Amino acid sequence: MARKTPIEKVRNIGIAAHIDAGKTTTTERILYYTGISHKIGEVHEGAATMDWMDQEKERGITITSAATTCFWKDHQINIIDTPGHVDFTIEVERSMRVLDGAVAVFCAVGGVQPQSETVWRQANKYHVPRIVFVNKMDRIGADFYNVENQIRERLKANPVPIQIPIGAEDNFRGVVDLVEMKGIVWDDETMGAKYEVIDIPEELREKAEEYREKLVEAVAETDEELLDKYLGGEELTTEEIKKGIKKGTLDMTITPMLCGSAFKNKGVQTLLDAVVDYLPAPTEVSWIKGIDPKTGEEVSVESTDNGPFAALAFKIMTDPFVGQLSFIRVYRGQIASGSYVLNSTKEKKERVGRLLKMHANKREEIKELPAGEIGAVVGLKYTLTGDTLCDESHPVILEKMEFPEPVISVAVEPKTKADQEKMATALAKLAEEDPSFRVHTDEETGQTIISGMGELHLEIIVDRMKREFKVDAEVGQPQVAYRETIKAPVDQEYKYAKQSGGRGQYGHVFIKLEPQEPGKGYEFVNNITGGVIPKEYIPAVDKGIQEAMQNGVLAGYPVVDIKATLYDGSYHDVDSSEMAFKIAGSMAFKEAAKKANPILLEPIMKVEVEVPEEYMGDVIGDINRRRGQVQSMEDRAGNKIVTAMVPLAEMFGYSTDLRSFTQGRGTYSMEFDHYEEVPKNVADEIIKKRNG
């Protein structure tokens, strides 16, 4: 079957933004102008097409990334919706993996917000070229040039406006296109569907000339030929300027800036033109890397229809009508409904049921999905987020996604005994969809513990259990994911010998425990020489140590960042076994850890609080009371921004407290930053409580 859209004309883009920058509204307008949704959904009233889960409608924030397809100027644009709340950075990372380019939306009033910095860093990490859309130009306090400065200073990027606004706040009418040097004003009567091209207004002429010059200079620097021409005093043609903007965008030396007001229907068509003109096709980004599972060698996967099939599953969702949907991005070859593919990550064969393309929340059934495309597969049994699907005869494993460890846990129990099983099923399904969410049973209390990236993250999980799986759950007090580690190196011998009639047990080890740098994790070194412990027992010692690390010696929290070296020991021909050495390893670790100056670690959150100046003193006083350390203070749009490192344990219920002492005018965001030693007086309390 021939492709409907040649791969050069496909754009896979994400629209990334801070919570209130107006991302969903922008996406809605794109869908409106590209002719798919004829009625514009307003987030304020909770009817946006992209936000299709109930809670998103209520909270007005976008949670799951749905992939939507639309068309503009004979190009196909696949939009991956990315959430803007910091508890969902995992979703953002996940969508960054499969995008080729992004539109970063900033609010013309609020500018660069803390979350935008996180998202920007993630886009840098995955080398995602992006263009900037400064939204909400109609709002009081809108300042395009201020946002330009913030992008330069805070995000360390090189923003190059390719438009400047005509008017601002209530007088915002349109933009000056610096490439064509024309004005564009939108017609309010037709909801912005009509616009007219005008000469640049007299009062903006000088500013337009100044910014045109900056644009041409930035473009000239992307290419030797253009630079020679520019330095020789020649004019660059419109074509050359466009070519230069695209080149600079793709190699991320420049970030084109546009502006508008999605809500007032201004600037959306020019944004779509920029997506088509300046963001890359799948063939214009670097080939994705993979591993050949047979040899372990690195291979490159080219974006082309001709070649063995290879795709990445980036999102699993449960759909009430068709069951489990696996959203995939095809990198090479194509996939057909009814065919068989290999899940190389799990080494399982999968049958492809139906293939769907999503248009906001309508679905279209398709027969094939070619390279560079994004769609959903129905009927996969084993595939989870981050798995690779490929041709059985050409296995490849595409890059793995890295998921952060959860930092907060709560105990959940169903309100009725009858719901116990339903709850277990619901949680298992939700954990399949979201790798940053974990479920386990506490061995001592038998309680079900759920862990995630923040309070909001867990609230939404509990909420989804209720809505989608009809399970009402009681939620306990949030618990912090403490860890333990050691500060001093220790040598330890342990001999496990049991003689009680019949076959005995014998394992004898000498280990050295040493602290590692924070975040380095666990390392096991085998320094046994001369066969004092036979090879086959070495992994058992390692396993014993790792099992003992699950419950630390201070308060039973997992132990992190240690290096264990096995350097001596002895064995018995008859009585030694894997079991005996596992016990010896485990006991040696426990004994050593007690002497190695064990300490408790707690997650420290990077907290950003934005408040009017008069509440600044209260905020800082409160942060100090919470054992926090203020890192910096700055001004943003007439408010004060306080950045601080605060232990997660002290942050519970912060939103309520902040609301009360700022009369609801303070906002904050927080994300996990690192683990740090708990002060002794606090640690003693925690240990006493845990050990009862």
UniProtKB/Swiss-Prot annotation:
Cellular localization per UniProt? Cytoplasm
Query: Which coarse location class applies to the principal site listed for this UniProt protein?
Result: cytoplasm
PROSITE patterns recorded for this chain? Answer: G_TR_1, G_TR_2
Stored InterPro entries:
EF-G-like_DII, EFG_II, EFG_III, EFG_III/V, EFG_IV, EFG_V, EFG_V-like, G_TR_CS
Cross-referenced Gene3D superfamilies, in alphabetical order? 3.30.230.10, 3.30.70.240, Elongation Factor G (Translational Gtpase), domain 3, P-loop containing nucleotide triphosphate hydrolases, Translation factors
- Give one GO term, molecular function aspect: GTP binding
- One term under GO cellular component: cytoplasm
Biological-process GO terms, alphabetical: ribosome disassembly
Top-level taxonomic group? Bacteria
User: Keywords assigned by UniProt?
Assistant: Cytoplasm, Elongation factor, GTP-binding, Nucleotide-binding, Protein biosynthesis
Q: Which CDD domains match?
A: EF-G (cd01886), EFG_III (cd16262), EFG_mtEFG1_IV (cd01434), EFG_mtEFG_C (cd03713), EFG_mtEFG_II (cd04088)
Residue ranges annotated for the tr-type G domain, each copy included: 8-283
Recorded hits in PANTHER family, A to Z, give: RIBOSOME-RELEASING FACTOR 2, MITOCHONDRIAL, TRANSLATION ELONGATION FACTOR G-RELATED
Function, as annotated: Catalyzes the GTP-dependent ribosomal translocation step during translation elongation. During this step, the ribosome changes from the pre-translocational (PRE) to the post-translocational (POST) state as the newly formed A-site-bound peptidyl-tRNA and P-site-bound deacylated tRNA move to the P and E sites, respectively. Catalyzes the coordinated movement of the two tRNA molecules, the mRNA and conformational changes in the ribosome.
Family, per entry: Belongs to the TRAFAC class translation factor GTPase superfamily. Classic translation factor GTPase family. EF-G/EF-2 subfamily.
The protein in question is named Elongation factor G
Q: Which species does the entry assign this protein to?
A: Nitratiruptor sp. (strain SB155-2)
